[in-house]
Amino acid sequence: MSRSVKKGPYVLDSLLKKIEEMNKANDKKVIKTWSRASTIFPQMVGHTIAVHDGKKHVPVYITEDMVGHKLGEFAPTRTYKGHSGNEKSTSLR
C-alpha cells in the first residue's frame, strides 16, 4: 500500500537540510543515513548517500532514474550465499 497523496512523500528533515546546504555550497560529500524510508527527491541527484543496511553503510550514488524511490531499495539487507554445493555426488546410488 502506497502513501496517501495528501500527506506527500516522506523524507527525513535533517537529511533534506544537509542536501540543501551542500547544494548551496556546491559541495559533494558522502552523507551517512539510517533513514531507509526516505524518498529520493530531485535535489539529491548527483550526491552519494551512505544508506545503512543493518551492518554497514552502503554508498548509493543518486541518479535521475532513482527519483521517487526509497533509499532502502538500493541497499539490500540480506546476503544470498547460494544454495549448498554439489550434494548429488555424495548420495548413494
From Swiss-Prot:
One of its GO terms (cellular component) is cytoplasm. Disulfide bonds: none annotated. SUPFAM superfamilies: Ribosomal protein S19. GO terms for biological process: ribosomal small subunit assembly; translation. The keyword Ribonucleoprotein applies. It holds the Pfam family Ribosomal_S19. GO terms for molecular function: rRNA binding; structural constituent of ribosome. The keyword rRNA-binding applies. Keywords: Ribonucleoprotein, Ribosomal protein, RNA-binding, rRNA-binding. It comes from the Bacteria. Belongs to the universal ribosomal protein uS19 family. Protein S19 forms a complex with S13 that binds strongly to the 16S ribosomal RNA. This is Small ribosomal subunit protein uS19.
